[in-house]
């Protein structure tokens, strides 16, 4: 694997870890206590992170 390809794999691993933590947070009581505007931002963030993760998976699949 080329160095630039390994960086993409590493990036995907890091992103997946962060996304997993965010999704767990979204199911928690702290999230439920946040103002609706902040809940909306966090929900949008998780959706964008999921799309980003999909793009990285596609890139890795093309190696």
Protein language model regions, located:
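Extended, charge-rich alpha-helical interface modules
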Residues: 1-63
């Amino acid at each position: 694997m080329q160095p630039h390809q390994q960086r993409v794999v590493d990036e995907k691993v890091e992103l997946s870890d962060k996304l997993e933590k965010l999704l767990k947070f979204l199911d928690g009581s702290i999230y439920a206590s946040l103002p609706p505007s902040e809940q909306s931002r966090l929900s949008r963030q998780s959706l964008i992170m999921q799309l980003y993760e999909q793009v990285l998976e596609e890139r890795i699949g093309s190696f």
